[in-house]
From Swiss-Prot:
The protein, known as: tRNA(Ile)-lysidine synthase
Alphabetical list of SMART domains matching this protein: TilS_C (SM00977)
Gene3D superfamilies: 3.30.465.60, HUPs
Gene source species: Bacillus licheniformis (strain ATCC 14580 / DSM 13 / JCM 2505 / CCUG 7422 / NBRC 12200 / NCIMB 9375 / NCTC 10341 / NRRL NRS-1264 / Gibson 46)
Pfam families: ATP_bind_3, TilS, TilS_C
Membrane spanning residue stretches: none
Amino acid sequence: MKSIEDFMKKYELSFDGVTLIAGVSGGPDSMALLHALHHTVPASATLIAAHVDHMFRGEESERDMRFVQDYCEAEGIQCEAVQIDVLAFAAENNLNKQAAARECRYAFFQELMKRHRAEYLVLGHHGDDQVETMLMKMAKGTVGIGLAGIQPKRRFDSGWLLRPFLKLSKDDLLAYCKENRIPFRTDPSNSEDDYTRNRFRHHVLPFLKKESEDVHKRFQSVSEFLTEDELYLQALTKDKMNTVITSKSSSGVEISIERLLALPMPLQRRGVHLILNYLYENVPSAFSAHHIQVFLDWISQDGPSGSLDFPNGLKVAKSYHTCLFTFQRLQCENVSYHYEISGAGEEELILPGGSSLHVSGPGSTRKLQGNDVFATSPKQVQFPLYVRTRQNGDRVKLKGMNGSKKVKDIFIDEKVPLSKRDSWPIVTDAVGNIIWIPGLKKTIFEELDVTNNDRIVLQYRQHEKCRGLAKNETGY
């Protein structure tokens, strides 16, 4: 197949005497790949088909496995197949089905690479997959090289992962299968709209193809441009971060806040990426641009100290002019704060710990749902408002009860961890009345009249729950 030959020429690859693992599901994409490799690689190379039965569809998925095994036997291709109870793995590791399937699949590929000392893992992702992936990344707010989608060549284990079909469409591969009489299996779940990718595939991609039949080629060109730009910016960031990082070890990195904030914003964001990728071994999904900006806003604020929780036990501690990223347990620090909210217009207040309060200006008609949203007005309280940490003797007048209740007792009732109580935000009015404990309790000072033109709405966002940044930011 010319596509594979062009790919080898572009990336200066030689398959002489090497071992290649081809991921084969039994669908048209991977069967076209297996056929093309079988008729392209030299006789000195070893080609191994790798199939994973995720056990999602019982006997049907087992038939897919036998189909791949039978095809390989007929064509004289070595085949490695495995059955993995992915649903059980997902439950044990708190993953969704698709993420668990991918993790299990790539773990098997990695095992085969080691066992057979293979140089290359080759997969059948095509141009339509690339379009879907890039659109999904944009919709999620992915930053950096993740926006470039699927990489055609990247490091994998001790070798390389190759995707030679990214300039071909799904229709190209179906035509290749038809022309060469290549059998394949069809997964009925691909026709359902249960998964995000399928919704993009069924409803967005057809529209784009009507506008431009070669849209996959356009997206692949953009992906390559983005990758080249990002690699340059990453190299520049690495150079600049040498002056930002004051110390580092396997468990922690300390930086100068002043030096980080002195960098241009694109390098600040990538600097945070580099630190997280250095520290994490197996990282959750990538941060969005919003999450990165929240972190940078947090360290930009006045205040000598504070802490922020990242996924998988990573702590970030701000202390005067430095910031420490570490997996080690932090000593308790004074994280008290006291901020003013004028209520004159829309504003966002980033709090120590990474959470925030968003204020909608006077006249907001937003409906209130849950304890993360609260409305008030000059009719109910005296402005300005203040956001502070708890104080000894704090009491609050809750809706629907006589008298007042200790804030300490509310924290106990709501099972707020001891480590978070001293930094939990409390909103008061100008004379010290506690009017709201964000995320926990509302008070008698709430304004429910949406026609009140002086009404303002406050929304509490717990950004510390955001997920982490992956080492392979594309996820592919």
